[in-house]
Swiss-Prot record:
It catalyses: 2-(N(omega)-L-arginino)succinate = fumarate + L-arginine. The keyword Lyase applies. PROSITE patterns: FUMARATE_LYASES. It comes from Bradyrhizobium sp. (strain ORS 278). It is found in: Cytoplasm. The lineage of its organism: Bacteria, Pseudomonadati, Pseudomonadota, Alphaproteobacteria, Hyphomicrobiales. Pathway: Amino-acid biosynthesis; L-arginine biosynthesis; L-arginine from L-ornithine and carbamoyl phosphate: step 3/3. This is Argininosuccinate lyase.
Length: 463
């Protein structure tokens, strides 16, 4: 006869391989706080509804608090033979309060229990990630204000395109992080419904109060369909989708840090705090923190893809496949949280080489668009014609091996005789960025204003 809690109709013990593949405690032990909170809410509701006595409910609550303390202190013994976090907690509760512990599972299944636990866990992860992203935004916006007027090259195709400011570049990532936070908030809102009380799949005949347990656990409402409550994991998928997009944003900035710290580029420097050395080349300072952030993006995206594949062919309701929903997600959330903290640290640590940035901003004829705009504005030339004229002037400067602002006025007039000396006032990188005053543009005044607005917004969110 099986000694499992589900073993009443079984006459043989599970094979050892079955034990190994079925056990999940190594992963779902991380749900202990959520499992205990949900059990306390369930016990209180059962007592309020007259399904169990108030004395039993109080004993359950005291026992569950003891278990929480034991796990927190590291003295709790997790047993693989008990399969999962639910049975480990229930078994220990039986040791603490006796047979009354068996009444805790009244009107409840492990199906709605784990769905509730995991929703609570993901909700907690969202809140932690949001706080980390807010700190990341704070760091970026602070540095953006500091470097609102620091000119650097803006790139397209990784080629010098137009001058921008370093502060403007940093604010781009503040905006991305803001949208990331919005996606996590949206996922949290849809997540925040309680599966508890759905039981195995069809609900229960006991007169439970699902609204009471939902409220006790901070959910907005109970889920309206018991089949849906136990059989879907879209709340994890949606959160992993938000996490994947966020990780991609972090990875893009990390990639830029890797490029910019290269001696061949030299736009920024990281201190020893966020670099490592080589075991054989003593001169090396490697941007390993940024490289690892870039790599961890694959772990996050992989978790999303993995769970999508697990869920794609599952009929309703619960299937054991869904036991594989947690490990990848937990690892992904941990990886993302670490990546956010690492990027926050690097954002505060990095030091731009302002002279190198300014010099690089002028390379590659980056103010050519300013010349074309001058032709349109001053000579009333159609932009397409101005684009062509500017291209010829750039080709002439390239042939002579000089920067655009170094090309003699007479040489420009060979291409377009109407050009006057006034054009020289728009060809410096400083003039270029100062002229970009359109909303969202890179003009230093714009950047400072946007950075201050973000810092004010973040301060308001903290209150």
């Amino acid at each position: 006869m099986s000694n499992k809690m589900w073993g009443g109709r079984f006459t043989e013990r599970p094979d050892e391989i079955m034990e190994d593949i079925n056990v999940s405690i190594d992963v779902d032990r991380h749900l202990y706080a959520q499992d205990i909170a949900a059990s306390k809410a369930h016990a209180a509701m059962l007592a309020a509804q007259g399904i169990i006595t108030s004395g039993d409910a109080k004993n359950m609550a005291r026992g569950l608090d003891t278990i929480l303390s034991e796990i927190t202190k590291g003295s709790f013994e997790f047993k693989r033979a008990l399969e999962d976090i639910h049975m480990n907690v229930e078994s220990r509760l039986s040791e603490l309060i006796g047979p009354a512990a068996g009444r805790l599972h009244t009107a409840r299944s492990r199906n709605d229990q784990v769905a509730t636990d995991f929703r609570l866990f993901v909700r907690d992860e969202i809140d932690d990630i949001d706080a980390a992203l807010a700190a990341y935004q704070q760091a970026l916006a602070t540095r953006a204000l500091e470097f609102a007027g620091t000119v650097m090259p803006g790139f397209t195709h990784l080629q010098t395109a137009q001058p921008v400011t370093f502060g403007h570049h940093l604010l781009a990532y503040v905006e991305m992080a803001g949208r990331d936070r919005g996606r996590f908030a949206d996922a949290r809102e849809r997540l925040n419904e309680s599966p508890l009380g759905a039981a195995a799949l069809a609900g229960t005949s006991f007169p439970i109060d699902r609204h009471a347990t939902a409220q006790a656990l901070g959910f907005d409402r109970p889920m309206a369909n018991s089949l849906d409550a136990v059989s879907d994991r879209d709340f994890v998928l949606e959160t992993l989708s938000a996490a994947s997009i966020c990780a991609v944003h972090l990875s893009r900035f990390a990639e830029e840090i890797v490029i910019w710290t290269s001696p061949l580029v030299g736009l920024i420097k990281l201190s020893d705090k966020f670099t490592t050395g080589s075991s054989i080349m003593p001169q090396k300072r490697n941007p390993d923190a940024a490289e690892l952030v870039r790599a961890k993006t694959g772990r996050v995206i992989g978790a999303l893809n993995g769970l999508l594949i697990v869920m794609k062919g599952l009929p309703l309701a619960y299937q054991k496949d869904m036991q594989e929903d947690k490990q990848g997600a937990m690892e992904a959330f941990a990886a993302l949280s670490l990546a956010i903290r690492a990027m926050t640290g690097m954002a505060l640590d990095l030091v731009p080489d302002e002279a190198r940035m300014k010099a690089a901003a002028g390379e590659g004829y980056a103010t050519a668009t300013d010349l074309a705009d001058w032709l349109v504005r001053t000579l009333k030339m159609p932009f397409r014609e101005a684009h062509h004229v500017t291209g010829r002037i750039v080709a002439l400067a390239s042939k002579q091996g000089v920067a655009l602002h170094e090309l003699p006025l007479e040489a420009m007039q060979e291409v377009e005789p109407k050009i006057t000396a006034d054009v020289l006032g728009v060809l410096s990188v400083e003039a270029s960025v100062k002229s970009r005053t359109s909303f969202g543009g890179t003009a230093p005044k714009n950047v400072a204003s946007q950075a201050k607005a973000w810092l004010k917004r973040l301060e308001k969110q903290r209150k």
